[in-house]
């Protein structure tokens, strides 16, 4: 879906009119947050966000995978597989398309074992059988089915939470206060102060707050140096993708926004390719978008023309984050003895 513009502006007539529906939605969401979940056979670390749309969960998950591997853990990611047709539980492999398992699981499976499961408890059980010493739950913060031993929330420092109203009047998935109360660590990504009060609330409740930034992979930058590009994206926050390109010196001659998880058609990609060719531009998109395009054999010729812009997450105080993860896993394992 494409986010309504009024979510990230002052409180508007649209949000006021939707407030009664939002109140009902929020009451149900708050009740779900309070429910006890089923405990998995190994520690579960949830990477989530407070709101609908993108916040950087996927690169955060992949960085946590690297951190955990460095201390001898065997992480396996469990994902609902949003946008895919398979209910699972199933381990993502090279034969799966993004249409089967979702674009994010397909992309992450290049780096880490990924289990797609509508039932997150069953997903965690399969992850354990696949050798997981710790489960990384991709999203699912507001879903009560699986108990979380640690909740790591990501938030954009500049964008924050918009009008801070509950869906559909605003972007929040549930009332903010109970979400903050259940946050064990907050990763504030980028520059800005829109999340400062939330960070303060997490600290006051004994949680960890660290700052981080997206850093482009050198291989991506090398392919774009000196080029004028046509950038396109169908993610939660396309503006952040475009801003990251510009920040690192990439000349954006044209930019195209699509809805999050948009299923690109051959006609759309042909139009993009034709515009790029006419203007002498390089086509560039996100890894997640390219995962959807590559999964469709009819789009293979277009996929070969597109440069994926890959980013990693750089955490400022990674030592504090590592200590946090160790402590939460140690506590979780002691509770299971």
Curated annotation (Swiss-Prot):
InterPro entries: LpxK, P-loop_NTPase. The keyword Nucleotide-binding applies. GO terms for cellular component: plasma membrane. GO terms for biological process: lipid A biosynthetic process; lipopolysaccharide core region biosynthetic process. ATP binds at residues 51-58. The keyword Kinase applies. Keywords: ATP-binding, Kinase, Lipid A biosynthesis, Lipid biosynthesis, Lipid metabolism, Nucleotide-binding, Transferase. Pathway: Glycolipid biosynthesis; lipid IV(A) biosynthesis; lipid IV(A) from (3R)-3-hydroxytetradecanoyl-[acyl-carrier-protein] and UDP-N-acetyl-alpha-D-glucosamine: step 6/6. It catalyses: a lipid A disaccharide + ATP = a lipid IVA + ADP + H(+). Its EC number is 2.7.1.130. GO terms for molecular function: ATP binding; tetraacyldisaccharide 4'-kinase activity. Transfers the gamma-phosphate of ATP to the 4'-position of a tetraacyldisaccharide 1-phosphate intermediate (termed DS-1-P) to form tetraacyldisaccharide 1,4'-bis-phosphate (lipid IVA). Belongs to the LpxK family. NCBIfam families: lpxK. This is Tetraacyldisaccharide 4'-kinase. It comes from Afipia carboxidovorans (strain ATCC 49405 / DSM 1227 / KCTC 32145 / OM5) (Oligotropha carboxidovorans). The gene is lpxK.
């Amino acid at each position: 879906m494409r986010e309504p513009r009024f979510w990230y502006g002052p409180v508007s007539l649209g949000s006021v009119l939707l407030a009664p529906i939002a109140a009902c939605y929020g009451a149900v969401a708050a009740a779900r947050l309070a429910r006890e979940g089923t405990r998995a056979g190994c520690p579960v670390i949830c990477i989530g966000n407070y709101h609908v749309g993108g916040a950087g969960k996927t690169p955060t998950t992949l960085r946590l995978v690297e951190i955990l591997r460095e201390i001898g853990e065997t992480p396996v990611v469990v994902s609902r597989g949003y946008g895919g047709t398979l209910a699972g539980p199933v381990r993502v492999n090279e034969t799966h398309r993004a249409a089967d398992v979702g674009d994010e699981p397909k992309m992450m499976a290049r780096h880490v074992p990924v289990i797609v499961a509508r039932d997150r408890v069953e997903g965690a059980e399969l992850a354990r059988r696949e050798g997981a010493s710790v489960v990384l739950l991709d999203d699912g913060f507001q879903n009560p089915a699986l108990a979380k031993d640690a909740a790591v929330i990501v938030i954009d420092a500049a964008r924050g939470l918009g009008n801070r109203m509950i869906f559909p009047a605003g972007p929040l998935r549930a009332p903010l206060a109970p979400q903050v109360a259940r946050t064990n660590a907050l990763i504030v990504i980028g520059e800005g102060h829109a999340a400062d009060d939330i960070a303060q609330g997490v600290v006051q409740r004994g949680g960890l707050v660290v700052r981080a930034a997206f850093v482009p992979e050198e291989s991506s930058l090398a392919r774009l140096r000196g080029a004028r590009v046509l950038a396109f994206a169908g993610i939660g926050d396309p503006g952040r993708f475009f801003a990251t390109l510009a920040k690192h010196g990439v000349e954006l001659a044209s930019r195209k926004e699509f809805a999050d998880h948009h299923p690109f058609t051959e006609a759309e990609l042909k139009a993009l390719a034709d515009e790029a060719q006419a203007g002498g531009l390089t086509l560039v998109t996100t890894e997640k978008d390219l995962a959807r395009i590559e999964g469709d054999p009819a789009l293979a010729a277009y996929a070969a023309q597109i440069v994926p812009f890959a980013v990693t997450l750089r955490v400022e105080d990674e030592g504090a984050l590592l200590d946090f993860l160790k402590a939460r896993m140690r506590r979780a394992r002691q509770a299971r003895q």
